[in-house]
Amino acid sequence: MGDSESFVGKNWNGLKDFWSDRLSFFENYTRFTKRDAPLPSWSSSDVEEFIASDPVHGPTLKTAREAVTFGVTGAALGAVSTAAFAWKYSRSPHGAALSFLGGGVFGWTFGQEVANHTLQLYKLDTMAAQVKFMEWWERKSQ
C-alpha cells in the first residue's frame, strides 16, 4: 500500500509513446494548423491549378476529390433512407433524427469504402498529395 500511483500514472510514458506512434500522421499537418497566421482560403480554381501544375501529386489529389462525391452520396442516401424507415415504423421525431445522423455517418463511411475500391485509393498516397498541395498553397500565398 506504499505505492498509491494509479495504473495510468505508472504507465503514462508507455501509453503516450504507443498513441503517438499510431497517431503520428497528424504531424504531417501541424505546420499548417499551428501557424501564427492561418493560410488564406483557396478556391476550386486554385486546386485545379495545382492539379494541372503537379504531374505526380495532381492526379492523386484529383482522384481524392472525386472520392468525396461517393461519400456525400452515401451520406445522403444513408441519412434519408434510415430516417424514413424510422419515421415510417415509429413516428418518433427524435428516433428519426438519430436515425438520420446514424445513417449519414454509416452512409459516408460506406461511400468512402466504395470510393476506396472503385477509384483504387488504397494504391495512392492521398495524404502526401494533400500535404504537397498545402505546401504549394503556402508558397503561392506568400
UniProtKB/Swiss-Prot annotation:
GO terms for molecular function: protein-membrane adaptor activity. Pathway: Carbohydrate metabolism; tricarboxylic acid cycle. It is found in: Mitochondrion inner membrane. It comes from the Eukaryota. GO terms for biological process: tricarboxylic acid cycle. The keyword Membrane applies. GO terms for cellular component: extracellular region; mitochondrial inner membrane; mitochondrion; plant-type vacuole; respiratory chain complex II (succinate dehydrogenase). It is a peripheral membrane protein. Keywords: Acetylation, Membrane, Mitochondrion, Mitochondrion inner membrane, Tricarboxylic acid cycle. Signal peptide: none annotated. InterPro entries: SDH6. The modification N-acetylglycine is found at residue 2. Component of complex II composed of eight subunits in plants: four classical SDH subunits SDH1, SDH2, SDH3 and SDH4 (a flavoprotein (FP), an iron-sulfur protein (IP), and a cytochrome b composed of a large and a small subunit.), as well as four subunits unknown in mitochondria from bacteria and heterotrophic eukaryotes. This is Succinate dehydrogenase subunit 6, mitochondrial. It comes from Arabidopsis thaliana (Mouse-ear cress). The lineage of its organism: Eukaryota, Viridiplantae, Streptophyta, Embryophyta, Tracheophyta. The gene is SDH6.
